[in-house]
Regions:
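A membrane-interface helix-boundary motif in multi-pass transporters
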Residues: 2-21, 221-231, 294-310
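Flexible cytoplasmic inter-helical loops of multi-pass small-molecule transporters
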Residues: 34-57, 332-333
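Extracytoplasmic gate region of multi-pass secondary transporters
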Residues: 65-114, 152, 183-194, 201-203, ...
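A late C-terminal transmembrane helix in Major Facilitator Superfamily
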Residues: 265-295
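Multi-pass alpha-helical transporter architecture, strongest
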Residues: 29-36, 147-158, 310-333
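Helix-to-loop junctions at the C-terminal end of transmembrane segments
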Residues: 121-131
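Low-complexity, proline/glycine-enriched hydrophobic segments characteristic of transmembrane helices
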Residues: 152-238
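Cytoplasmic membrane-interface "Motif A"-like loop-to-helix N-cap segments
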Residues: 130-141
Length: 333
């Protein structure tokens, strides 16, 4: 956002910088993968010739094992998936699109909350070694179920102020740039307002100036960005932190939990299906279904939350009733 149009669209720079930097990450990733080896237990099975000939068949056609696959999906991972996506992606989308929070503020408050919450992945993983995985994940789901709507309602309440029509902007910035391949210009007018109670907001209006006629386009794009006061900003950081804390509770123990559910020779195959469906399908659909519900039932801005809450409720019931909370389980089978 601090780059000029020319710098942003430079042939070898600008928007390409993140992709150039990612080359380093690709190199690190390749190096790590080249140094990785099979787990000691799987290596032992392989040396003894006891690996599965058809892991797909053993995982999904064996009724007892397939039951565990389904239990892992519907009793743990689908809840973990929707809580992950709601606490981060849906929350950010809600702040920007529904609450109209300033783009840069929403990004920075998310980053701060994530930074503070990240160590809790390790904490809950460590604690699950001591007291078991199940109830840490179940408590995380329960907390999310009962607090999502109050948290998102707070987002709405603290950003619910209309843009007045009788107030002059504190400052006005007008920027023009040529549209690529034409002689027409894009006119961007940014106005910053401060309300009597200290609340701030910004409007961005874009118009097209046609070269031939010298006239403005009829169509306009108006963007309203609400700039959060300092107290509200940190309040939102705390609420986002709380939701990501739920993420750490359900996600921190999940890898060890899945490993402990399946025998070594078909472990990776068996745990892959519930993990990827739980996150990719149930979790991945949170933004889409949330938006679909919000546009269909416009009277309730929070209606999109019923999908992740409903999935988490179902997962909590199944997990609480049917999952076992084993500690220090021998996984050498």
């Amino acid at each position: 956002s601090n780059m000029s149009d020319a710098a942003f669209n430079a042939e070898w720079g600008g928007w390409r910088y993140p992709f150039w930097i990612s080359i380093v990450l690709v190199g690190v990733s390749i190096y790590i993968r080249m140094k990785m080896s099979e787990s000691p237990m799987f290596s032992k099975l392989k040396a003894e010739g006891k690996t599965s000939v058809n892991p797909l068949k053993e995982s999904f056609r064996n009724k007892a094992n397939f039951k565990m696959v389904l239990l892992a999906l519907f009793g743990a991972v689908m809840g973990q998936g929707v809580i992950w996506y709601t606490g981060q992606f849906y929350a950010q989308s809600f702040l920007e699109n529904t609450c109209k929070v300033d783009f840069e503020q929403s990004r920075t408050l998310m980053l701060i909350a994530i930074a503070f919450a990240t160590p809790f992945f390790i904490l809950w993983g460590w604690l699950s070694d001591k007291i078991g995985r199940k109830w840490i994940m179940m408590v995380g789901m329960a907390l999310a179920i009962f607090t999502y709507r109050p948290i998102f309602q707070t987002f709405l309440d603290d950003t619910k102020y209309e843009v007045p029509g009788n107030i002059s902007p504190k400052n006005l910035d007008i920027h023009t740039s040529l549209l690529s391949g034409t002689q027409d210009s894009l006119l961007i007018s940014t106005s910053n307002y401060v309300l009597p109670d200290g609340k701030k907001f910004q409007t961005i209006q874009t118009d097209t100036v046609f070269y031939n006629s010298g006239q403005l386009s009829i169509g306009k794009i108006n963007i309203i960005n609400k700039v959060l006061p300092k107290a509200t900003y940190w309040k939102f950081v705390g609420l986002i932190f709380l939701m990501i804390l739920y993420v750490t509770m359900v996600y921190g123990p999940i890898a060890a939990f899945l490993v402990e559910m399946f025998p070594t020779k078909i472990r990776y195959t068996s745990m892959s299906l519930p993990y990827h469906i739980g996150n990719g399908v149930f979790g991945g659909l949170v933004p889409f279904i949330g938006l679909l519900l919000s546009t269909t039932y416009k009277a309730d801005p929070l209606v999109g939350l019923w999908y992740p809450i409903g999935v988490a409720v179902l997962c909590l019931i199944i997990g609480a009733l049917y999952l076992r909370n084993k500690i220090d389980r021998n996984i050498k089978d």
